[in-house]
């Protein structure tokens, strides 16, 4: 793949043989952003798990302390009082049977979906539409619940879902290039802490193999996955 001149110039500033401390990595990622708009900052983790095995699938949610820089559009499958509560909490799309039919026909103008348990029998039929996109409500991630207001508020506040892909990678949006370094490091640390907490007991050998921070269209900066940074800037082993 041929890279642009600006990408190649940015990549020259990175030593790809070095593992950078998180604070240095976010500074370098912001410095080497190659787009003129407010780039998205992401982190990718390569895990030492076999995602083909159910007991090694790493899946969960994390509340980023500074959000992602984007307000998620939230759809809620609910009726009656729960629908009203979802709307009051800021849900963008709320409905029951008619909404389920719309989604079945391809409506996908949302970033997260929540459902009340009583509708999951019908929502479950949307698995082929929502599942591949990571949008299927799931009780393990708090998106199948009667407390729809809380779920909507958390998602709007920066709660994100994650799961390993078929190559054992995890991807997180941790903010925007306009965030300051401390905000990005704190979001990175929150994501890292949750990934470490969810290590499967059946995973053998090295669990966290690789971490990379990158911006939209920018080169990836390798991060030392054994370090995090506290607010004093001290390196702390994890």
UniProtKB/Swiss-Prot annotation:
It comes from the Bacteria. InterPro entries: Ribosom_uL1_bac-type, Ribosomal_uL1, Ribosomal_uL1-like, Ribosomal_uL1/biogenesis, Ribosomal_uL1_3-a/b-sand, Ribosomal_uL1_CS. GO terms for molecular function: rRNA binding; structural constituent of ribosome; tRNA binding. CDD domains: Ribosomal_L1. SUPFAM superfamilies: Ribosomal protein L1. Pfam families: Ribosomal_L1 (PF00687). One of its GO terms (cellular component) is large ribosomal subunit. GO terms for biological process: regulation of translation; translation. Keywords: Repressor, Ribonucleoprotein, Ribosomal protein, RNA-binding, rRNA-binding, Translation regulation, tRNA-binding. Gene3D superfamilies: 3.30.190.20, 3.40.50.790. The keyword Ribonucleoprotein applies. HAMAP family: Ribosomal_uL1_B. Belongs to the universal ribosomal protein uL1 family. Part of the 50S ribosomal subunit. Binds directly to 23S rRNA. The L1 stalk is quite mobile in the ribosome, and is involved in E site tRNA release. This is Large ribosomal subunit protein uL1. It comes from Kineococcus radiotolerans (strain ATCC BAA-149 / DSM 14245 / SRS30216). The gene is rplA.
